[in-house]
Amino acid sequence: MNEKIIKSENDELSVSFQNVKSVCVCYSIYPLLQFLLLMDENMIKKHTCYFFGSEIPYNIRCKLPCFCYETRPAKTFFDKIKRIVTKIKLRITKDSLYPFLKDADFYAQDFGYLSILLGNRPYSMLQEAPNHLNFVGQEDSVEFQRLKRKSKSLKGRIESFLYGSIAAGYDGNNSQCKALYLTEETNAVVTQNKIIHVDSLKSLWEKSSESKRKFILSVFDLTDDDTEFLAKYPILFLSQPWVNDCYIKEDDYVSLLKEVFEYYDPKEIIIKCHPRDTFEYEKYFPDIHVFSKPINMQLLMLVAFNTKKAVTFSSSAVDCLPENIEIDWFGTPTHKLQKQTDDMAFIFNRAYNKINWKI
């Protein structure tokens, strides 16, 4: 009987089912970067199977031995029903499809579709974004209270029955989560009775070997040309995937952008797209340069990229920037959008300029 092999699509890496020792579950590239920095090079290349949501860009996931599932929000009624069926099917078949899940160590973003893979097994939680638990893990936060209500609701109980207990108790807020890997300190209530590991991305990067650093840069396709191109512009606009995530309509998003860009010289500003953001900025703002490679700001900072000013609606990425970089923070103009994006929950650890909306 032939041994089953998981290959990267670029054919450079492979791991047999028998050799899988760890499983990495990610929807976004911040926890993927964190995982690659936490593990040794041998583990990340030869003994890990990656399960990615479709939000992970193809040019990244094709370089790692992985399985990818369509996890973007279902828009039509038919798509929503189809998604429910495929999730139930995955819960029933996961152990026969992927027998290595029974013995592997799990490192995961623990919400949504792919949390089904965890079943009732213990796992370690990777951090979704900078300061994530400071936003969602506080008892008075919007997200914490929403999850609390969901866990007691009929919908939450049905989802827990269909998909597993984590469906209504993610972000580490369950008994299966044994450890939290964080990039900063937090006093979030979900940290109680768990093993806490705190290592900044910078400290993990500095501890990494030169060969591992090169491998990580190759995975994310970050080159010297990229950093030199970005450094030409003194003002960096950090976008957010609001249209992709169905938080806002395209026309409304363009209106917000127009007001923001009125404050700056188009020759001095560059749009640095969020890794999930596929919005066509060139179509509406042909005079402004765009950097659309799916690379997170934190990785750019690790390779000594710098700028004079960062501008954003409410991107948490600005909190990783050094004090010498000025920040213009616009926030969100409507209460509905604030609730959707958790803008109101953002906790700043540094000085910034709050820009008021005219609309």
Task: Indicate residue ranges for each PLM-predicted region.
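N-terminal beta-strand-loop-alpha-helix module at the start
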Residues: S8-M43, P234-S239, V254-F261
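Short hydrophobic beta-strand segments
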Residues: V15-Y27, C49-F51, K102-Q109, E228-N244, ...
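Active-site and donor-binding regions of nucleotide-sugar-utilizing enzymes
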Residues: V23-Y170, A317-D319
